[in-house]
Amino acid sequence: MGCAPSIHISERLVAEDAPSPAAPPLSSGGPRLPQGQKTAALPRTRGAGLLESELRDGSGKKVAVADVQFGPMRFHQDQLQVLLVFTKEDNQCNGFCRACEKAGFKCTVTKEAQAVLACFLDKHHDIIIIDHRNPRQLDAEALCRSIRSSKLSENTVIVGVVRRVDREELSVMPFISAGFTRRYVENPNIMACYNELLQLEFGEVRSQLKLRACNSVFTALENSEDAIEITSEDRFIQYANPAFETTMGYQSGELIGKELGEVPINEKKADLLDTINSCIRIGKEWQGIYYAKKKNGDNIQQNVKIIPVIGQGGKIRHYVSIIRVCNGNNKAEKISECVQSDTHTDNQTGKHKDRRKGSLDVKAVASRATEVSSQRRHSSMARIHSMTIEAPITKVINIINAAQESSPMPVTEALDRVLEILRTTELYSPQFGAKDDDPHANDLVGGLMSDGLRRLSGNEYVLSTKNTQMVSSNIITPISLDDVPPRIARAMENEEYWDFDIFELEAATHNRPLIYLGLKMFARFGICEFLHCSESTLRSWLQIIEANYHSSNPYHNSTHSADVLHATAYFLSKERIKETLDPIDEVAALIAATIHDVDHPGRTNSFLCNAGSELAILYNDTAVLESHHAALAFQLTTGDDKCNIFKNMERNDYRTLRQGIIDMVLATEMTKHFEHVNKFVNSINKPLATLEENGETDKNQEVINTMLRTPENRTLIKRMLIKCADVSNPCRPLQYCIEWAARISEEYFSQTDEEKQQGLPVVMPVFDRNTCSIPKSQISFIDYFITDMFDAWDAFVDLPDLMQHLDNNFKYWKGLDEMKLRNLRPPPE
């Protein structure tokens, strides 16, 4: 159907960088069209396959416009078409005509209202500009409603030209209700019209173009065989495709707008729901098997994938759920996806599936696989069947093997490398290659992170045995905190601060600082109240624990234990830790810090294993000292009722506390150092950073607290806490850092001397007292073990003072090393 005879259309090309024919000056009087020209259609010149549009800026310079990008979708914007509806030619009409010419838009002008709809249905204009200044000559609002009545106008931008008025502005709601997109206050200036068109092109028109593209996306959703559901961040259902309705037995009208919680679910899966929510609330996808209830009450097993969608403000605005029913009626692909997904769910929930049900599932899958054996190789299906009964890592390897069969060669080779890594025993511990330029680092790694080489000569190293009982001291043990001598009380005045002087307390207590600092620290945290024990019982316990530290050790003595206890208490007082840990966690941390090196012989695990010591034999060369510290501490505690701080606890509380203490003491073993740090970074730091980027809202804070307070994450936090407390010497003020470096070096020197005397392997050759560079050893220790761990801990707890000390101390050791000095301090000037 053509346009009315009154509509005249002509087309011509605009020469590049050439002035428009008969272009009028940009005067306030407005432009005039050449005599007899009613319309102008000005197509942009475009070569075949051109991916950029061209328009001109105010100076006539060509401007490139990229294709429209809509998510992962890219499409080209055709030359825009503009329909001008003016009852007479005036300056405003001519201004828009010339602006269209300047912008390179096709322009059509019509004067008769009755011809507008027919013309629009023929051309499908992107922009319609209607003269709204003379209602008696042209009822613009009625015309707009008429256009909007056509479904084809859904994505059309309609602009109304209104008069400039001096009186008070009226509401534009009637204007919008009529169907107008926006209004334009009359201004015939060509540049004003041109700028308005550009704003429309890159604003409303571009947005409508994207909305129009959504039709193809919705078409795909509506015709998808997968059931798809979209909900808001508050879990209100916004969309459900026909496959979802068919699967669940609901109609769209029953679901749209309803809260997800109102839809019947299997209440027995509360733990699974918690797992799902904890995953998707931090922006991670979740996939697994989920049992839902249909409208008619039937249970249905689904392979569900839930994808959080980030929207405005970087926050999660929608959740997309893609659902497949695991009914085995169709293809082997669906079978494999269901089984693989079920595997993922097992890992997520951490629960064993019912053995009987599991075997039924295996038989069902095997039966279905027989029907489709021609579609998939038997080897793939055999691997997939085994997933339901194998260990998690085996399931992962099987899934990768199955994926390799249909992957191109580069992907297959990359997956081979992944499998090679997965088959190693230490997934979280980095592999260290020998560094020729850093023998100190090599020796530290070998000496602290291995159990040594077993000596086969038959010679055995026997630790000096002593009775595990209280050792007499030349100082008076206090009856209570109120009975502490004045000098010792003064030495403990600043125990709440990080720069607390532990060496002053050591001197005041004649090398027995643990009992005094322990009494004060435990009182501050209310440990006696939690354990339901008296202060005298706690005092006796601290006495027997301290008595079993070797005062002859330069480093691993009760002063080190008191220092670790102080650091632990300092960390526990930080706000993030107080919000995360429970009282029982605090008690476990303080007790673990107190006992973590009890009866330490002043030798490393590697030394004991190489020497064939009684402890190494007892603990099978695995975490020898750490196992001994924990076991002996509980033997000492429970062996005498007078010092048994656990005697009044409920059995379940005691078991939980004991487990927490042992876990923290074992975490101080350096062979697991990188495993603990990497797990903390991946499970705590990274998810926390993602959540905190979303802003500090009450809802977001609740998600953070829920994530941090899971038992698994609290365990990781406690391990990291005691690890950092145990090796915090490089983060102490410089004078204390130097003293600790002197003590640990002397202990290592003594071990090297004994290894040479007994003909044992020397596990740390650089710690030879005649040749060792203490600055180099400190630099290597900080580089390899301290920096990354404290960066992660600081990101979680916020410890600016410690990080400043660490930086200062590193610079100090670096300066000594650059001066080729091997001692603790520079020579006096």
Curated annotation (Swiss-Prot):
Which of the residues bear the PTM Phosphotyrosine? 461
Q: Which residues form the active site?
A: 556
**Has UniProt tagged this entry with the keyword Cell membrane?**
no
Q: In which tissues is it expressed?
A: Expressed in most tissues except thymus and peripheral blood leukocytes. Highest levels in testis, ovary, small intestine and colon.
Could you say which EC number(s) this protein's record lists?
3.1.4.53
Which keywords are on file for this protein? cAMP, Hydrolase, Metal-binding, Phosphoprotein
Q: Where is the PAS domain?
A: 213-283
Pathway of this protein? Purine metabolism; 3',5'-cyclic AMP degradation; AMP from 3',5'-cyclic AMP: step 1/1
| Role noted for this protein | Hydrolyzes the second messenger cAMP, which is a key regulator of many important physiological processes. May be involved in maintaining basal levels of the cyclic nucleotide and/or in the cAMP regulation of germ cell development. Binding to RAF1 reduces RAF1 'Ser-259' inhibitory-phosphorylation and stimulates RAF1-dependent EGF-activated ERK-signaling. Protects against cell death induced by hydrogen peroxide and staurosporine.
The record's family statement is: Belongs to the cyclic nucleotide phosphodiesterase family. PDE8 subfamily.
Q: What is known of its domains?
A: Composed of a C-terminal catalytic domain containing two putative divalent metal sites and an N-terminal regulatory domain.
What is the protein name stated in its UniProt record? Answer: High affinity cAMP-specific and IBMX-insensitive 3',5'-cyclic phosphodiesterase 8A
The organism's lineage?
Eukaryota, Metazoa, Chordata, Craniata, Vertebrata
